[in-house]
Amino acid sequence: MVSASRRITAGEFQQCVDNGVAELVEIKIGYDGIVLAHSKNVPPMSLTNKQIYLALAGKIPNPAAPEQFIDNPYTSWNEIDDSLPKIKIGVMGPPPSSGTRDAFVSLLMEKGCEQIPTIAALKQAKRSQFDTLCQSIRSDGAYIETGENDNIIVQKLEMNPTDLGILGYNFLDQNRDKLQGSLLDGVAADYKSIAARQYEAARPLYLYVKKSHIPFIPGINEFLYDLTSEETWGEEGYLREKGLIPASQQERQEFRKDALLLKDFTL
């Protein structure tokens, strides 16, 4: 079994098939959100997808000649938009191997990228260039890779109060005495906004089970039965206390049925 902070891709599933793992069970466990958190000792920030993209992209359109792309020149937030504070751009986050990084890029960077006309025009005409521009994060020190342990980011944000940190919502929720989340297009990351999918950076969480192991490893069926019970992942389930935002009742019923019937995964 493996848990994932995004859905498996077609390429990853094909890699499983190529290695003899053709039968998987997919269970959507619930929801989480990606947040840009920072210290409570500084004023709160309100950001848009476009501002986030312009702060962290490796290359952006040249303001003087938008058809040309240049290395990201921005060093302070107010250079992007004068409504933003005059503080150095510093964002701590996970490495490329992280599912949280993938989610951050797809939910925030790419959406912001598409709001820039000269880049959006490349989506159909030059898809490879479009993907590179939208998905590449700058490497000049404005983005600081801090590993895949969100607790380290929490600790570093206390020491660097003007920096932002890319975290899962549950880590923000567990550290609200020290941290606050940036508004995203005017919406705060909280239980209600993520559950209602009003917060743009909400993401589903998954569990994948290798079917061929089930007959030989005791307890997997029982584990799936318990995991998909209302006492575990429901509105009052104990996973909510750990930061999970439950899926809708309809989704929970559908994925419990899939889990108990060991339904084959399909894209």
Question: Which residue stretches match the model-derived regions?
Answer:
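Flexible loop/hinge segments at secondary-structure junctions
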Residues: 1-267
